[in-house]
A protein has these predicted regions:
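A short acidic, glycine-rich active-site loop
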Residues: 98-113
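Interdomain/boundary linker segments immediately adjacent to catalytic/signaling cores
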Residues: 1-42
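Conserved catalytic cores of phosphodiester-cleaving nucleases, focusing on short active-site segments
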Residues: 67-69, 73-99, 118
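A short acidic/basic microdomain associated with nuclease active sites
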Residues: 40-68
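Nucleic-acid nuclease catalytic cores
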Residues: 119-147
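Amphipathic coiled-coil/heptad-repeat helices and related helical stalk/stem segments
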Residues: 61-63, 111-114
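Non-catalytic C-terminal interaction segments of nucleic acid-processing enzymes
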Residues: 136-187
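Surface-exposed alpha-helical segments enriched in charged/polar residues
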Residues: 38, 116-120
Length: 187
């Protein structure tokens, strides 16, 4: 994320077309995944045969998995990715973002329902959930991540938590972040 951010990409408001401040922070989840995946491929940091975005689920092809790594149809990894951006580009709280992480309702396509979807999807390889987001002094990610882990444990078995920090981002609001991931197992 840091190397993509260093190029100062500019996202635009979906409704007005107005540009946001430079940086990876204001980009949509899909755009961020695309930008970071392309950067990892360019740098050679993906040490596998390949990857593909938006891969149909084996058992429900109308649903798409955010990222599959390896060679299809027997992917090494199927990964659902969710963004946790608690503040908007304007510095105001994003009031409904926790729904995208914690909602138990499939219609919300949350991180929580992504776990159960992955566990029952029919992928032959391993499955994982990745949550990336931005840290703010008054809105740290840890309480939301811990809440996710507690809720997810009701539906699936989570592997060990992996995480890394993202620092010195160029956006004036989305200045730093964290990336979390867990391997997902059916209960």
């Amino acid at each position: 994320m840091e190397s993509v951010d260093a190029r100062r990409p500019i996202a635009s408001n979906a409704r007005t077309g107005a540009p946001y401040s430079p940086g990876i922070g204001p980009h949509t989840e899909r755009a961020t995944v695309q930008l970071v995946s392309e950067e990892m491929e360019r740098q050679g940091s993906i040490q596998v045969e390949g990857f593909q975005l938006e891969v149909p689920y084996p058992d429900t092809p109308w649903n798409k998995c955010d990222l599959c790594i390896g060679v299809g149809p027997d992917w090494d990894w199927a990964v659902e990715i969710k963004m946790l951006r608690l503040m908007g580009d304007n510095g105001k709280p994003n009031d409904n973002i926790l729904m995208h992480i914690l909602s138990p309702y499939p219609e919300h396509r949350s991180a929580l329902t992504g776990c159960t979807k992955l566990a029952n999807a029919g992928f032959t390889g391993r499955t994982a959930l990745l949550i990336y987001g931005y840290e703010y002094a008054e809105w740290p990610m840890e309480p939301a991540i811990k809440s996710f882990e507690i809720l997810a444990d009701q539906y699936v078995a989570l592997g060990s938590r992996n995480h890394s920090e993202v620092k010195q981002l160029v956006h004036p609001i989305h200045k730093s972040g964290r990336v979390f991931s867990w391997e997902i197992f059916a209960k």
